[in-house]
């Protein structure tokens, strides 16, 4: 962030480095792969998964936010590569006016916040499915609509709230950087996202543990057990997806926090070398459709295996009670 449109020497050195250029190319590759894997994820989601329609819609909404973020971050990556190759000798036209960046910044925040809020929405939907005794299509459709609208409203408002009263009269080297006067609120937002991701992780762990204990409650009712197994497998896939995203975001955020903390103790060269790789959010976003595809295929395999076990299993009442006792130990 700067009051001048001219870049300082450290920024020019950073953009001129092979490390910076390589990182932007890797980001672009991750962005392109996100678009490709999203196509396969949506196709598999509607042709091979046994998720409820409400879960499918919320997953598609999350994929939309992921691709929205990647698209606009890709525009920034191309801009930064252009500067690295063609504007190094023109430092006074290097910086971007905040007034021209604010639209991109709001959209990028809409994408990133939409993914976090969307994960929370998915877990709320799974909580309803897990604890509702009669989770019919009509009920799931209503809950899905409410969650989707809330996620849309919150994600659309995030960027506007952060830059609410910012004069937006400074300069930045990239449009995904928050405006100078909004920097503190942007940090509060990222802290909120970290807390919300942690809450999502705790909810996912609770649901997984609860479903594990409830898995054998319908041991002697094959039809009910089959339906329960479908619910457990779909919920397990969503929870694993959330846990994986939490781990990725946590490592990314923790790395950035450590780097900022030791910034004064290391040289500009080392800082510039590390920061572009620790801020690798396009790679984190790529993981979402990839893990989704993996989870759909894995859940189908586990479901088929469980059906086979249910059909072939012959268990006495004593065996069942022993297994139930072990589950609660």
Swiss-Prot record:
GO terms for biological process: detection of chemical stimulus involved in sensory perception. It holds the Pfam family 7TM_GPCR_Sra. Signal peptide: none annotated. One of its GO terms (cellular component) is membrane. The chain crosses the membrane at residues 25-45, 57-77, 104-124, 144-164, 188-208, 240-260, 273-293. Keywords: Membrane, Transmembrane, Transmembrane helix. It comes from the Eukaryota. It is found in: Membrane. One of its GO terms (molecular function) is olfactory receptor activity. InterPro entries: 7TM_GPCR_serpentine_rcpt_Sra (IPR000344), Nematode_rcpt-like_serp_alpha (IPR051080). It is a multi-pass membrane protein. Belongs to the nematode receptor-like protein sra family. This is Serpentine receptor class alpha-2. It comes from Caenorhabditis elegans. The gene is sra-2.
